[in-house]
């Protein structure tokens, strides 16, 4: 059984990952010198090779985005100096380095020293902007620390004579290349500070290789420039050449000629500046006077506008405008009221009952006339019918029959006597005549014999 406090158990993947992270975090970026072997460049453009010495070797990879900055083609057996990151290729567990830059061994060692000194001085704060001194403007005397036979001195003097012929120049000749050069440059800077003859120094030389410019990467020169009480302009090599002196100097010029232009005054430019300043001053004065004149005119107009008579006139004008507005408003109100009245009258006329009453009365009169006509027609018709009925009634009336000589006899109970069997001898009868009544007593009842009517004889048809 495993003990209760057993160590952690790693998988292979986790082990490789942990080792890779330790290498990358603890080692960081390093400089390595060695001999190239097994160099290859597949279609991807990356470089793969082995870096070795007499006792060991290590696999290297340099990716395309890094190797495109290398200015030479690496060869088998070539001694190089590389700047690389140490890592582990996890899938195979191979320890390798990822190369960021590569240089031939000679220049590479110098570059390594350059980077180390740069990092050291950066950590000490020698490059910080707060230590930079401002250049005098204008400079009253210029000191030049360079070779008295070099092209740099010729270029500096040529520019100074062209731009500012009256500017004093003090030359502190010194060697700028070789083992003695750093010490001579340091002594020249100290001499210039001790004599205090100039208020700005140009320290530099012409272009060259890294070895040629190495005097200006010397720590002694860098510290002498930093300690100088006189502002220093570095002018080493060409624009692409950057030395430690450039970082520690108060100002870096890309070339010696540019340094001379920086510390000198261009008399023609000064004249143009004076003329431009005079023109700006005249324009400013003209503008000031014109603005004062405009201001005076504005104040004068304001005073005139504040005069009581003008204020009264403005108030009268405003009053007249108000009066006109009031008149227009009243007229407008009256017109609108009149229009509303007309519309109201029109609506009242439209709904007035008098015309309707007249129409109704006319209708009633027409109906009364028609009714009277109808009534007259009906009365005439009824009179005619009544007359006909009267005539007919008179024709069938018993009275009319009586008037023709007939009479009506009724028995005692009022029943009209129609047959003899209705009475007997001794009954009283009442007879109605045309002009009165006659009462009689039955004395005798004698029935009448019935006679049969003859049938008409048939007639012969005519022959």
From Swiss-Prot:
Any one Gene Ontology BP term: DNA catabolic process
Single GO cellular component term: exodeoxyribonuclease VII complex
Enzyme Commission number(s) of this protein: 3.1.11.6
Enzyme class: hydrolase
Primary localization: cytoplasm
Keyword rRNA processing: no
Reaction(s) catalysed (UniProt annotation): Exonucleolytic cleavage in either 5'- to 3'- or 3'- to 5'-direction to yield nucleoside 5'-phosphates
Localization of this protein: Cytoplasm
Superkingdom of origin organism: Bacteria
Alphabetical keyword list: Cytoplasm, Exonuclease, Hydrolase, Nuclease
GO terms, molecular function: exodeoxyribonuclease VII activity; nucleic acid binding
InterPro entries assigned to the protein according to its UniProt record, in alphabetical order: Exonuc_VII_L, Exonuc_VII_lsu_C, OB-fold_nuc-bd_dom
Functional summary from the UniProt entry: Bidirectionally degrades single-stranded DNA into large acid-insoluble oligonucleotides, which are then degraded further into small acid-soluble oligonucleotides.
Subunit structure: Heterooligomer composed of large and small subunits.
Family: Belongs to the XseA family.
Protein's recorded name: Exodeoxyribonuclease 7 large subunit
Organism: Klebsiella pneumoniae subsp. pneumoniae (strain ATCC 700721 / MGH 78578)
């Amino acid at each position: 059984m495993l003990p209760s406090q057993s160590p952690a158990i790693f998988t292979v993947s986790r082990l490789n990952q942990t080792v890779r992270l330790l290498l990358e975090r603890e080692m960081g970026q390093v400089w390595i010198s060695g001999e190239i072997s097994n160099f290859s460049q597949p279609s991807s453009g990356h470089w793969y090779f082995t870096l070795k010495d007499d006792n060991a070797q290590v696999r290297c990879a340099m990716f395309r985005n890094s190797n495109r900055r290398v200015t030479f083609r690496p060869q088998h057996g070539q001694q190089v100096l590389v700047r690389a990151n140490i890592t582990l290729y996890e899938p195979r567990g191979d320890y390798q380095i990822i190369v960021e830059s590569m240089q031939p061994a000679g220049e590479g060692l110098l570059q390594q020293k350059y980077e180390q000194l740069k990092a050291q001085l950066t950590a000490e704060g020698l490059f910080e902007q707060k230590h930079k001194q401002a250049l005098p403007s204008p400079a009253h005397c210029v000191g030049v620390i360079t070779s008295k036979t070099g092209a740099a001195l010729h270029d500096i003097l040529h520019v100074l004579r062209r731009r500012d012929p009256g500017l004093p120049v003090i030359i502190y000749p010194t060697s700028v290349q070789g083992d003695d050069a750093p010490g001579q440059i340091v002594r020249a800077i100290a001499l210039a500070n001790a004599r205090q003859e100039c208020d700005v120094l140009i320290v530099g030389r012409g272009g060259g290789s890294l070895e040629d410019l190495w005097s200006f990467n010397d720590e002694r020169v860098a510290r002498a420039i930093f300690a100088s009480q006189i502002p220093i302009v570095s002018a080493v090599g060409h624009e692409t050449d950057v030395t430690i002196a450039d970082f520690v100097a108060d100002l870096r010029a890309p070339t010696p000629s540019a340094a001379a232009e920086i510390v000198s005054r261009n008399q023609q430019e000064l004249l143009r500046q004076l003329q431009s300043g005079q023109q700006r001053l005249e324009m400013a004065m003209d503008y000031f006077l014109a603005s004062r004149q405009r201001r005076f005119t504005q104040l004068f107009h304001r005073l005139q506008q504040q005069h009581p008579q003008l204020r009264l006139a403005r108030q009268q004008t405003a009053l007249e405008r108000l009066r006109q507005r009031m008149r227009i408003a009243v007229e407008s109100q009256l017109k609108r009221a009149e229009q509303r009245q007309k519309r109201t009258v029109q609506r009242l006329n439209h709904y007035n009952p008098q015309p309707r009453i007249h129409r109704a009365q006319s209708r009633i009169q027409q109906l009364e006339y028609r009714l009277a006509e109808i009534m007259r027609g009906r009365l005439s018709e009824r009179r005619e019918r009544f007359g006909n009925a009267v005539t007919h009634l008179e024709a069938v009336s018993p009275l009319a029959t009586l008037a023709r000589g007939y009479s009506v006899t009724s028995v005692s109970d009022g029943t009209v006597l129609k047959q003899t069997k209705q009475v007997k001898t001794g009954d009283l009868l009442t007879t109605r005549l045309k002009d009165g009544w006659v009462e009689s007593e039955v004395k005798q009842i004698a029935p009448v014999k019935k006679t049969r009517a003859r049938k008409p004889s048939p007639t012969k048809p005519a022959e």
